[in-house]
Structure formats: C-alpha cells, structure tokens
A protein has these predicted regions:
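Structural signature for extended repeat/solenoid scaffolds and their inter-repeat hinge/linker regions
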Residues: 2-9, 13-338
Length: 338
C-alpha cells in the first residue's frame, strides 16, 4: 500500500494539469532526478504557478491532497508527506511547502516550532503576526484538523517561560483588518505603552498586561500609528526602549514592518555560521512570501545589506534548489532587476 501511494505521489509531479494550462511536459531518463522525474522541468513549471494554480493542483490530485471534512482546505496524506519530504530532501522542503495549502503549511510549522521549544518561539510570533486574521484563523483550523488539538491549548501547555502569555494571546488573536483608526485610542495606547516601558523591568515587559493587550488585539494599521505617535511624542523609537533580545521586538517588527523583519531573518539564514533553525528560514521565507510581499522584502534586503537578495541566494544555495528560490524572488521584481 505504501509503495503504491508513493508511486502515485511521485508520478503526479510528472503531470501537466490541463486546468493550469501549462504546455511544458516532464520527460523521463536515467540521468534525471528522483524516481525518473525531470527535476528541472518540474521546478520550471511549479515556480510559475500562482495561488489559483496551486489550488487547482491540490484539487486535481486527490491521491495526495484530501479535502478536509470540516474546513475548506486540502491536506496532505501523512504517509505521503513523509515520503515526499524524503524524496525531495535535496530541495529542503521547498517543493513540498510550495504545493501545500497555506493553512496546512502554517499549522505544521507551528507544530514544529512547539516541539523545538524556546529556540523556535520566534517562528510562532512570525506565523501569528505576519498573516492576516483570516489566514491565522485558517491555520488554527488546519491545526485542529491535523492534530485533534488546538494551537491555543498546545501553546498554553507547552510554553513554560515568560513568553507564554504573549504567545497564547498572539495565536488566539483575530484582529480588525480594516483601514479605519481612532486618533484618541492611538494616543491612549501610546501613553500606556510608554508608561509600562518606563516603569517596568525591561526583561519582564513581555508579561505586562497592557503591552500584551495592545500588541495582541489592536489592528496592524492602528499599531503602526501608535509606533509613529510614540516616536513623535517621546522623540525615540519604541524598539530602542525594549530589551535587545526581547520577543516584543520581533512582534512589533512582524506586525508593523514585515519586510524589515524578513530581511533580518534572511540575513541570518544566509550566514556561514547559521544554525539549523536559521538555515530553514531561507526556504520558509521565500516560499511563504513569494505571493505576498517578496518585492518589498527583496528591496528592503538590498537597502539594508547592499546586496541583491537573488545574488545572495546564488552565493549560498546549490543546484535546482537554488534556481527554484532565485526564480521565486526574481518573478516578484520588475523586469530588469536583479
């Protein structure tokens, strides 16, 4: 049974779906990639797909992706996921993450972060703060479907440090996503933040109820206005008033300036001394942001580090994996850009 499922799973990557209207076909030969699939041709097709193409792919490949019985997403068969991750190991999960439903992808990453403990709490912050309210809700639903538990209860029971209150509130949040703000509320929140920061222990601010309330319930556009008001009122950036290693910093960057946050993560991921968590972020960031804000991230990376992001990936990655990531970056940029 397992062998049959594996053959189905791998064969599907050698199919050009009519609904996607891709003309290129995969070829098979002794010198080609895994199980005879022409990896280069496969990646050339996959990297062109927009979200609607990926959705069609999942819907048309019921041998791999099953419609969830409760929620509107397609999830990967567990046994097939293990096989695919093994067979596509050289791509460092890029192909698997790219084809997976975003809700499932985020849910599985959250689960992995919880298993790794404190060193991966930043990933939980990233998932909770850089997604829209509906995307985060979708990930929470997928988490329930995949693991028969809620992400909220797992964070509450498995995080035992001072980050627990903040992380539970972040993953539980459903923020207002509209464009309206209230000037009075902005000023009040600015004053409350400054008061909490000025009288509190910097290393304990993450437990401050007012700070946690504001950062986990207010809309992103409201928080951007609060950060601006803080700067104008007190003549300093709120980031300067926080502990250097504080999770609150990552929370604020993820909520208010994702391109700057992701640029920093990518810089860490491409350093020679990067640890496992940092290295994995290269795949994660490029794949999850390719259809969101990759143009902004690439421009911010270039501004901060004086090197085009695509060139940096060329320098540190290899083979088809490198080509896949570079193409995802370049397709988001204006023609003629590096």
């Amino acid at each position: 049974m397992a062998s049959k499922l594996l053959n189905i799973a791998l064969a599907v990557f050698a199919i050009v779906l009519p609904a996607v209207a891709m003309a290129t076909e995969f070829t098979v030969g002794d010198d080609q990639g895994i199980f005879g699939v022409d990896e280069k041709s496969m990646l050339e097709i996959l990297v062109k797909w927009q979200p609607e193409h990926l959705s069609t792919f999942r819907n048309e490949t019921s041998s791999i992706f099953l419609k969830d019985e409760r929620f509107p997403f397609e999830k990967c068969e567990e046994i097939l996921l293990k096989f695919l991750k093994r067979e596509f190991k050289r791509f460092k999960d890029a192909v698997v993450q790219w084809t997976m439903h975003p809700w499932e992808r985020d849910a599985r990453m959250a689960r992995k972060a919880l298993k790794r403990g404190r060193q991966a709490y930043g990933l939980l912050i990233e998932l909770a703060c850089t997604r829209s309210s509906d995307e985060l809700l979708g990930a929470r639903r997928a988490y329930q479907s995949l693991y028969s538990e809620s992400i909220e209860e797992d964070v509450a029971s498995q995080v035992d440090g001072i980050e627990r209150q903040l992380l539970v509130a972040l993953v539980s949040s459903y923020r207002y996503d509209g464009s309206k703000t209230n000037d009075r509320a902005i000023k009040l929140d600015t004053q409350k933040l400054e008061k909490s920061i000025s009288i509190g222990d910097k290393k304990q601010l993450i437990k401050d109820e007012e700070i946690v309330r504001i950062l986990t319930t207010r809309s992103k556009i409201h928080l951007m206005a609060v950060i601006k008001c803080y700067q104008e009122t007190f003549n300093k950036n709120i980031i300067e008033d926080l502990d250097e290693e504080s999770s609150l910093k990552d929370t604020i960057y993820c909520l208010c300036d994702p391109p700057q946050y992701f640029s920093k993560i990518l810089d860490s991921a491409t350093k020679a001394n990067a640890n496992k968590n940092e290295k994995e972020a290269l795949t994660r960031v490029i794949v999850t942001r390719a259809n969101v804000d990759m143009k902004d991230i690439a421009e911010e990376y270039d501004r901060q580090y004086k090197t085009p992001l695509a060139q940096k990936i060329e320098d540190v990655a290899l083979g088809n994996y490198k080509d896949f990531l570079v193409t995802l970056v370049q397709r988001a940029l204006p023609k003629g850009s590096d």
